[in-house]
């Protein structure tokens, strides 16, 4: 499933907040910024968040 730019922005913000609050990163990196770590997780496909899209009837 390809993410839209809006879904990426929402997931990036939520994941960055989780990491800055003490959640463990799912990747190994030398970055200190939670935003950069979250972005790398999204690029590698290892972010533990998934968007829920409404089903069209």
UniProtKB/Swiss-Prot annotation:
SMART domains: RNA_pol_Rpb6 (SM01409)
Main subcellular localisation: cytoplasm
Molecular function terms from GO: DNA binding; DNA-directed RNA polymerase activity
Entry keyword Nucleotidyltransferase: yes
Origin superkingdom: Archaea
Gene Ontology, cellular component aspect: cytoplasm; DNA-directed RNA polymerase complex
Localization in the cell: Cytoplasm
InterPro entries assigned to the protein according to its UniProt record, in alphabetical order: DNA-dir_RNA_polK_14-18kDa_CS (IPR020708), Pol_omega/Rpo6/RPB6 (IPR006110), RPB6/omega-like_sf (IPR036161), Rpo6/Rpb6 (IPR006111)
UniProt KW Transferase keyword: yes
Pfam families named among the record's database cross-references: RNA_pol_Rpb6
Gene3D superfamilies (UniProt xref): 3.90.940.10
The reaction(s) this protein catalyses: RNA(n) + a ribonucleoside 5'-triphosphate = RNA(n+1) + diphosphate
Catalytic activity, EC: 2.7.7.6
Protein's GO biological process: DNA-templated transcription
Keywords: Cytoplasm, DNA-directed RNA polymerase, Nucleotidyltransferase, Transcription, Transferase
HAMAP family: RNApol_arch_Rpo6
The family this protein is said to belong to: Belongs to the archaeal Rpo6/eukaryotic RPB6 RNA polymerase subunit family.
Subunit (UniProt): Part of the RNA polymerase complex.
Function: DNA-dependent RNA polymerase (RNAP) catalyzes the transcription of DNA into RNA using the four ribonucleoside triphosphates as substrates.
Name of this protein: DNA-directed RNA polymerase subunit Rpo6
